[in-house]
């Protein structure tokens, strides 16, 4: 057999091409109105990122950095560490042993393709599309004839890349708890669906369908089928997305089978709390175990609640969400407090120095809350999303796009190595799930801004942008002008093609309603007396908030202008007294941004920094600091946005400050 050498050469060329791939300059909105894949089964659907063009000064530079720097960097790292080579060895186009240290290394390739595909939706780029075609060609080589695709097992089932993966007889599916065969398939499917939406090409989708069809044939209670559930969840949401674009109910049924049989000892030997496999999912009411697995599972459960109208699933996800937000979420939106097991702790167990808060968990939580919003339309889910995105999620990536946090601690002493062996950001990890998950997620952010029904538009997030889509039968163009999150003033231009009546719901952020997060885990020490206001065409409007939204139903016409003002002031946040680590401490916020003090700005007095009753603060824009940020300062200290810490070397940091009456 002739050895396949072209793709590896292509990888090196791909990196060079990508470095030169600047975003296609395109501020106009595509005329098509592509429906989001999340739509089917939900009453509310997100407006697809193809219909939303950002021009803001906060998110757009971050997305561009991922497009122009991080994707190329990750391809280079994956090439160096043998991610691509594994597919070629599995397909017998190269000889060798498995490269890498994790049984899920294949997923780094899939997540890069997914994130890059999302950039193609926002801004078509033929060069980047050719790079993806090369990567997909390599993936295809590693797929077995019947659709199976986990390269380490194909290369040598007797020698997994990690010693903690058990080998019994070397058969497929024999160690589902830890083999990550299902997890690999889940990321493959999710990435393939996004790539298909972005390009209309089936080259990646056909690989995923072939793989999914093998799962449908293999798993179940029928004669000769394998019983069991994934060790690491995500295949459930992948299968449901595949069902949504193909209409093939077998995928939905298998996703539900996996969820229905979690916690079922008659189906398999249970994996325990770590994998949320201790009791049936519909009986679970406390978030436990590995945080990333958990939120991926809860997202799948929410899909099932929406698709099947199963009230037992709906009740379970509501109970789980309430437990997480009320008792186990950090002020930054981070979740999963324990390094041991990368897991949720007990209720109110929220340490700062040793906080884990895996970046992947923050990303998974956004995916889950987005689904909950599509199910219920309540702003509380976007309060969680906004807090997470601006704080404990983008803290995971540096301002250069080439260094990362895997955990996201809320305190650093300059000694404790919280970041997988380092006190500061790292250039890569042996387990590189977080960097590639950031690539996967960040380009999808424009798809979070709006949601809609036939006659209701939800404005969920605020960012300068131009958008065009159909609202029912109405062709609608809408634009935002704002300096959010540094300023709370937002201008919105509404331009329907024809005058008509419909409803616009404008989210009033929780912080602008004196609510840190839903529930009583955090409160502002002193409630703001300032109130959010709204005008339409220059006239003040008295409108009651409904589920956290200003709701305006009227006859809208071209040129209508909405002006929102969410007054910002420095707020001191206190924690529920049941959180022992934060007693007699406060954190500082300005708008949606959580602040931290860093030693580099406070060298002479860092260990003595405190907030006293009656302290005043000023907010100042520093355009040359950390890519341009608002800082909070007074005569005692200077604070920077938490997400931007550790971009200037190793040092101390803290979010929670001693409070003195």
Can you name each region flagged by the protein language model?
Residues 1-9:
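Bacterial N-terminal signal peptides that target proteins for export
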Residues 17-20:
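C-terminal motif of bacterial Sec signal peptides marking the signal peptidase cleavage site
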Residues 22-28:
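Bacterial lipoprotein signal-peptidase II cleavage site
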Residues 28-126, 130, 161-198, 233-250, ...:
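Aromatic (Trp/Tyr) and acidic
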Residues 127-153, 252-260, 312-328:
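Carboxylate/His-rich catalytic cores and anion/metal-binding grooves
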Residues 155-182, 189, 205, 209-230:
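Asp-box/WD-like beta-propeller blade repeats and closely related beta-sheet repeat scaffolds
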Residues 317, 383-391, 396-495, 513-536, ...:
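C-terminal beta-rich recognition modules with glycine/proline-rich loops and embedded aromatic residues
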